[in-house]
Amino acid sequence: MPGGHHLYLVPGFFGFTNLGALRYFAHVLDFLRARSRALGVRAEIHMVRTHPTASLPQRAARVLETVAETMGREGAVHVIGHSSGGLDARLAVASGVSLPSDANVERVARRVRTVITVATPHHGTPLASFFASLLGQRLLRFLSLWTVYVLRFGRLPISVVAKLGGLFARLDDHVGLNIALLDQLFGQLLADFSPTRRGAVETFFAEVSRDQALLPQLTPEGMEVFNATTRDRPGVRYGSVVTRARPPGVRSTLAAGLDPSAQATHALYQALYRLASRTPRGRVPALPPAQARRLRRAYGNLPGPGANDGIVPTRSQPWGEVIHAAQADHLDVIGHLHDPPRHTDWLTTGSGFDAEHFEALWADVAGYVFRRRRRP
């Protein structure tokens, strides 16, 4: 591919790239292909299959191996990671890195021109500490199946919604989290899949249960160690997409309407938002002036310590140049948003992020990669 480009899309924590038709980057892939054609750019886009919850070095090794196996002899390489996939991208091309792989780091790194991170917890997320607990792990298993179910069928069954009730009301205090009910609902959701799909989902969760090294590494304390030992590679451009969701409250609850499914997913969002907002003030990263200006321009003010996208604190996300700052939740930005007819929302957050915002975001990413920036 003389003068062309290889783009690698790296999924985040619990990325379900190996569940057949459930494509993690489905809408991103379609948009980037169309955008590259519109710009007259030759680009090949690759999906990276990482272990959903393995350690960062293990996941980064898989990124490295995928690039080495598919980049051919020519063409610039660009690595784009969503959520913890952005950390995989950084680590895979870091200066002086040693990874559990036989792939030649320097051979790959010489071709890398760009690393872009999207809603990535560069300074950790308090949610990782919660999900690393025994209760948190059981809830995470249920929430992951919830996500897969909603993306597959469009909404939760009313029988499940009815049982959720106040399950998430005091989630942040570990009070009222009924483990038996979670397991029952997990089984009920799983039973709705076809036998073939159910087998794929069960294999996925069995793989997850064998290796959950990633969670402790995504805590604010874990990322402090990561950043101290992971150096950006000279000559590589680093850009980031930053997200901030609407803080939940009375207005957002009313906006969710009377639909039981929307109210249930909004209750979950409220609980996740509260947990993700608990970054200790001493661990809120100071932003370089250019990053701070970009966030103020996008949001009207500099997001505080509690601002987040339902999973990752907003102030944890900038790394390098801020390419785009969106009012969106954590999965909105990869196309799982509330917008008919082709998109399915993950949670009812009231972010207002729609197909137009999605296309503007990824047009900015494509512009950064191909050096064809949009006018503000």
Positions of PLM-derived features:
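Lipid deacylating catalytic domains
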Residues: M1-P376
